Amino acid sequence: MKPQVGINGFGRIGRLVLRAAVASNSVNVVAVNDPFIDLEYMVYMFKYDSAHGRYKGDVKVDGGKLVIDSHRITVFQEMSASAVPWSQAGAEYIVESTGINTTVEKASAHFQGGAKKVIISAPSADSSHVRVGVNHEKYDPSMKVVSNASCTTNCLAPLAKVINDNFGIVEGLMTTVHSYTATQKVVDGPSKKAWRDGRTAAQNIVPASTGAAKRVGKVIPELNGKLTGMAFRVPTPNVSVVDLTCKLSKPATYDQIKAAVKRASESSALKRILEYTEDQVVSTDFLSTTCSSTFDARAGIALNDTFVKLIAWYDNEFGYSCRVVDLISYMFKRDH
């Protein structure tokens, strides 16, 4: 028995959650809702992907459904979350990937259509943040709406947990060198919130705000108030890298830190979530990787035994989407 899943919003994350779900075979996606993409266009958008390549299986329309290999998926085109008839397709676990319904109140609109649980694929101001491999044991079946946090929090949290558990983090600053996303501009345009966010993404390095480091405190309470960070949006289409610069409470050599991260990456708790490499890698080496965080042992440095800079890579699209699928699978097991 598998969780029956619906996806609301067929954008970057919605499509890649579907790819991850089909690949993992641990959940069954039975419905997709997007008011702006018709069925034929869904086939095209799922089949062809500029970052992750052409889908290697069979994608088609059959009997008014989106068919991916042997998976028959009902398609809705409702504007409002409350209007999506999820129960008609048997969908109970809803991935909210529009980027709009990110509060408990807004996400709860899905319950009107028969949803049982909602997983927000973005940070949320008021829902519980649950991260597989970091704080999944905090999930309780009474929780109806949960957030999988952001892709950057998903990269940072496993690394921060390992470092804090082994050496203690007094305080730290995070910088993510982040690929551009759909919120940025192809050419210079207006941006009321932050003017430089409106500059062309493919031509500039754009300093930007991010709450990813602060949100680590939501999944690791002992780090609450100890981390903050910022982003540089750079002209690459996918894959990003986190720089965690932190002060340790317990002195450690860089070799000891590497050993601790390597052990953690091989543990049952973090296997497939945190990986370790000593290869001389670059960003494209991580396209379509399924883990949340890959520690780059060669890239980090230490000023002394208590002040270090640690580097971790992540596919900010597909790696994140794989954790959404893992979270649904874990919730389903706990719920049943």
Curated annotation (Swiss-Prot):
Alphabetical list of Pfam families matching this protein: Gp_dh_C, Gp_dh_N
SUPFAM superfamilies xref list: Glyceraldehyde-3-phosphate dehydrogenase-like, C-terminal domain, NAD(P)-binding Rossmann-fold domains
Active site: C151
Any one GO BP annotation for this protein: glucose metabolic process
GO cellular component: cytosol
Binding-site positions, NAD(+): R12, I13, D34, M79, N316
Site keyed Activates thiol group during catalysis: positions: H178
Pathway: Carbohydrate degradation; glycolysis; pyruvate from D-glyceraldehyde 3-phosphate: step 1/5
Record InterPro entries: GlycerAld/Erythrose_P_DH, GlycerAld_3-P_DH_AS, GlycerAld_3-P_DH_cat, GlycerAld_3-P_DH_NAD(P)-bd, Glyceraldehyde-3-P_DH_1, NAD(P)-bd_dom_sf
Disulfide bridge partners, by residue number: none
Signal sequence, start to end: none
GO MF term set: glyceraldehyde-3-phosphate dehydrogenase (NAD+) (phosphorylating) activity; NAD binding; NADP binding
Top-rank taxon, per record: Eukaryota
Residues the entry annotates as binding D-glyceraldehyde 3-phosphate: S150, C151, T152, T181, T210, G211, R233
Keywords linked to the UniProt accession: Cytoplasm, Glycolysis, NAD, Oxidoreductase
UniProt main location, coarse: cytoplasm
Subunit record text: Homotetramer.
Similarity remark: Belongs to the glyceraldehyde-3-phosphate dehydrogenase family.
Protein name per the record: Glyceraldehyde-3-phosphate dehydrogenase
Source organism of this protein record: Echinococcus multilocularis
